[in-house]
Amino acid sequence: MPEAGLAEAFGVTEEARAKINLALHVTGQRADGYHLLDMLVTFADCGDRLGFLPAQTDAFTLSGRFGEMLAGDGGTNLVLRARDLLREQFGALAFPVHIHLQKNLPVASGIGGGSADAAAALRGLMRLWGMSLPVEALASLALKLGADVPMCLESRPLIARGIGEEIEAVPDLPAFAMVLANPLKGVSTPEVFRRLTTKNNSALSLAPGLSGSAGWLAVIDAARNDLEPPARQLVPEIAVISAMLQARGALLTRMSGSGATCFGIFASMAEAQDAAAALHGERPDWYFQATETVSGGM
């Protein structure tokens, strides 16, 4: 369904922006097994889209390039879990709703698609139902859906620590022209963490007063994604796709999250668009998307 069609068919629509881990440091592990992370996160101007409409009974429909991959996932889909959790808060006032998810992002690909969808569902349903929750209550509810959901609620540049629930805005982070690239190979997040050789790595360090793309690019380049080496063991195509981005002129390449999506930062959107088109020509069966990330000032 085209974006214009979604807006016409559904009275309330929300964007679920792709979440990009510019840096991800694994700094420890809690007694309950959750890993402690330091992350520099931003969000892209591409992603999934959700539509919401009053209905006689609850309904959930899918479209988009990757929609079929979620078909039959009604028991575990985060959008439906978000609906049900929010309905517990609002009770009978939360009338039945038809939710449509236009799934444009690859599934389980390290760019927060499911978490962003859940966050967009929370935002959209509150608008449709004409209700709201206090900020802290909404953040607590979001965390029940997953560690990434609170930051996806924000959808702006931030630093996330702990398991992802300790969030701090980064107002000075600039926008970046970028290509997202994914070989469409699944990566098991638990297996990636299991293969980590060290789990008590150095924390993310950001100098105060950073400004400008060049300064931030140097900081990001000096940082790392501790999950990339084990992910490359599981999916060798990650190394291939990173090299392809570099060959097309990327200033910096890195894997996002637990993979397999990689990003390449380019000097301009024109260069990013040219690179994405060329890469798609080389591998039309893979995913390439030129995009621009949001700035801290938004």
UniProtKB/Swiss-Prot annotation:
EC number: 2.7.1.148
Pathway(s) the chain acts in: Isoprenoid biosynthesis; isopentenyl diphosphate biosynthesis via DXP pathway; isopentenyl diphosphate from 1-deoxy-D-xylulose 5-phosphate: step 3/6
SUPFAM superfamilies given in the database record: GHMP Kinase, C-terminal domain, Ribosomal protein S5 domain 2-like
A single BP term in Gene Ontology: isopentenyl diphosphate biosynthetic process, methylerythritol 4-phosphate pathway
Catalysed reactions, semicolon-separated: 4-CDP-2-C-methyl-D-erythritol + ATP = 4-CDP-2-C-methyl-D-erythritol 2-phosphate + ADP + H(+)
Active-site residues per Swiss-Prot or TrEMBL entry: K19, D148
UniProt entry tagged with the keyword Transcription regulation: no
UniProt-listed InterPro entries: GHMP_kinase_C_dom, GHMP_kinase_C_sf, GHMP_kinase_N_dom, IspE, Ribosomal_Su5_D2-typ_SF, Ribsml_uS5_D2-typ_fold_subgr
Keywords: ATP-binding, Isoprene biosynthesis, Kinase, Nucleotide-binding, Transferase
Domain of life according to the entry: Bacteria
GO molecular function, one term: ATP binding
Top EC class, one word: transferase
Record-listed ATP binding positions: P106, V107, A108, S109, G110, I111, G112, G113, G114, S115, A116
HAMAP family the record matches: IspE
Entry's family note: Belongs to the GHMP kinase family. IspE subfamily.
Function according to Swiss-Prot or TrEMBL: Catalyzes the phosphorylation of the position 2 hydroxy group of 4-diphosphocytidyl-2C-methyl-D-erythritol.
This protein's name: 4-diphosphocytidyl-2-C-methyl-D-erythritol kinase
UniProt organism field: Rhizobium leguminosarum bv. trifolii (strain WSM2304)
Source species taxonomy: Bacteria, Pseudomonadati, Pseudomonadota, Alphaproteobacteria, Hyphomicrobiales
